[in-house]
Amino acid sequence: MMRKIKFRNITIINNLITPQDIAKLRKYIDYSPLQTEENNPNKFINVQDNECNTILSKAQQLLKSNIEEDFGISVSDEGIGTVVKFSVGWELPYHCDQWSNLPTYGGAPKRDISSIIYLSDDFRGGELVFPDLDVFIQPTAGSAIYFTGTEEYMHQVTPLLSGTRLTCTGFWCNLSGYDNVSIP
């Protein structure tokens, strides 16, 4: 059963993906070819399997409906097709997703809301941290988190010390015509 935990504009959904579906995804990921990008130590898996795509699409739709309900807005739906496998030693420095003014993966003009779906928890390190809010999140497999991309929600990911950290990241654009996103 899904369970939501909210703190300001940060929401964690536990059990977004069932343990059975996580096991199916992990089996597929373990046997899939890894892709790389220049100057990036992480590996990427483009999900080609119909059953796995169905699992990820269902999770994405659940995320979308929860985001729209919580923020009272309509958001872009980019879909999911890429899993990121993080390398030991990887970390993500303190940053804000909206500052970059980069389009979303789906081509929407900006990143108002960020989301992460966690497909593993058999790792040490790799915690999502919001230092200014004193929030530290140790993810669990099957959970998801979403939060506004504004300066108030600057965050980082601690160095991955061991294990396998698998995620699907998404960026959502507010399509309702408002400049800022906030939960009333």
Regions found by a protein language model. Give the residues of each.
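Fe(II)/2-oxoglutarate oxygenase catalytic core
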Residues: 1-144, 152-184
